Amino acid sequence: FKNKWTHFFISIPVIIGGSFSAFFITSVNSFMNTPAGFEIKNGRMVNVQPLEAMFNSSFMVRALHVVATACMTMAFILAAIAAFKLLRHNHTEDRTYHTKALNLSMIVGFINTVFSMIAGDLSAKFLHKVQPDKLAAYEWHYDTQSHANLVLFGVLNEKTHEVSGALEIPGLLSFLADNSFDTKVKGLNEFPKNELPPMIVHYFFDLMVSMGIFCFIISGLYMLFLIVKKLRKYVTSNLMLYAILLTGPASMLAIEFGWFLTEMGRQPWIIRGYMRVSEAATQAGGITLVTTLFGLLYLLLLVTSALSLIHISEPTR
């Protein structure tokens, strides 16, 4: 919009709507993992307490993680756009404008990457106490023990439970679980096999963390270059700009991998401890129609968003 106030006021309902959407999605997902606020009597849900269900035990930890990673991703997408513009434009006026945008985006991105890492650490500690089977699946951790290793990537033999080709960091899983290398971390062998999530969740965890670490390193280097005067010339070097260009898709992938992780990590439950996914499958009519309409709606949103972005990017600034 040419008028900055029009742009500002139109953004307000988007911010409010997006925030409420994030709140309710996170609340529902938290409820599915740590259900609360109801009783089961004669196969029926009774004595429902909506607020207790909404603000269940995992809500705050998950909400912090969602907010931090969303802000991080937003910042890195904007930084990637600014970096792309700087790689294309050589005019002094354009470079000044996009450099300011890049500085602000990278600072916000770095701060929220740190918050995301703190939120991730709190999530690991929460899983250790409340969903130890999920944490064990993330790390292919089968035997209960202290000084448990953090396993990165590798290949698991699900019959023998042997892991090959992995990078193992001694004791780090125990430390992440409760700030001590002596912490005992429960292994998968302590849980019923038919209640364990698919072991592929390990890769989603590793990919999510890898993307996050990459964004942290790039934004950390940028902050260093920005603070130290002798290194400031590297802030808009081509190598740095290309690296920043990658933080946009990397941060988006981190969020996607994170959602795959939390949703697949909840399996086989749709409501943990109460209802399996297989029990929740519906045979109601009209599902095909509803699914098709949703698909068409999102296709329309994709096209209109792409056209809007193309239109916005046409002016020089």
Predicted segments with their positions:
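Individual transmembrane alpha-helix segments
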Residues: S58-T69, E158-I213, T291
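Transmembrane-helix bundle segments that line or gate the permeation/cavity pathway
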Residues: F1, I15-I40, M72-F76
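Aromatic-rich transmembrane-lumenal/periplasmic boundary elements in polytopic membrane proteins
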Residues: F23-V28, V108-A177
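Membrane-interfacial loop-to-helix junctions in multi-pass inner-membrane proteins
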Residues: F1-I16, E93-M106, K233-Y242
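Membrane-interface transmembrane-helix boundary segments in multi-pass integral membrane proteins
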Residues: V61-R62, L127-H147, E279-L299
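Residue-level detector of conserved catalytic or cofactor/ligand-binding positions
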Residues: I310-T316
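Membrane-proximal extracellular juxtamembrane segment immediately upstream
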Residues: P249-L293, L297
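Hydrophobic alpha-helical transmembrane segments
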Residues: A70-A80, L207-L224, L297-S305
